[in-house]
Amino acid sequence: FVLASSGDTPYKNLAELASYAKNNDVVLGHFGAGIVPTKVSFAAAKKLGFEFADESAFDMLDCNSLSSGDADVINTTLALIEPCLNEINVLANIGEDRIGKLPNVATVAEQAGVNNIELWNGLFVKKGTPQNVKDKIAEIGKKAMLGDAAQALMKETGARVYWQDAEASSSRIVADGKKLAELNAILQ
């Protein structure tokens, strides 16, 4: 996920957005107030000393959302704004690392001091699944994530594609639960 604005806005990063928003109304478009990227956006604003004048959930947040003026800043995926990437400002990346395709765009964590939580997907099995089945699923999943198609998708879309085994994933769930609690505390 990224935070983006029209190319003609006077802010190019979160510090500039914060400065601008202290004296001007800025509307945030997002996919829902309860999802992690939106919470990160609100927490960053709070840490940087401003509030969005208004915010609204949308079914779609793409180039048209910015060009139509429906929102001043949108919280969306890089893939949805890819067609107009050269015409907009990507203010920040919401995630652990900078996006390879946008190496000069700092993460929200770097810019606002909020934690670096990000959305991720995983492979889950029903409790009681035999170990040999879990091992086979893990073998296939790892091969797919490290394969050429997945790596090409990462380069094309900016999505982070990687493999974590069951132990690392379990640890990540615990760590991300703590990060989410930290975000919720900031937003209280």
Predicted regions and their residues:
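Short, Asp-centered acidic motifs that coordinate Mg2+ and/or phosphate
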Residues: 2, 72-73, 90
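Short, well-ordered secondary-structure micro-motifs
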Residues: 40-41, 102-106, 165
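Hinge/capping helix and adjacent helix->loop/strand transition within the periplasmic-binding protein
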Residues: 1-61, 108, 118-153
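C-terminal lobe and pocket-closing loops
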Residues: 79-145, 175-178
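Short helices/loops that flank or line small-molecule/ion binding pockets
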Residues: 19-22, 42-47, 60-74, 79-86, ...
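Short beta-strand and adjacent tight-turn residues that come in two discontinuous sequence segments
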Residues: 31, 57, 75-76, 93, ...
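An extracytoplasmic/periplasmic, membrane-proximal ligand-sensing/linker region
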Residues: 47, 132-188
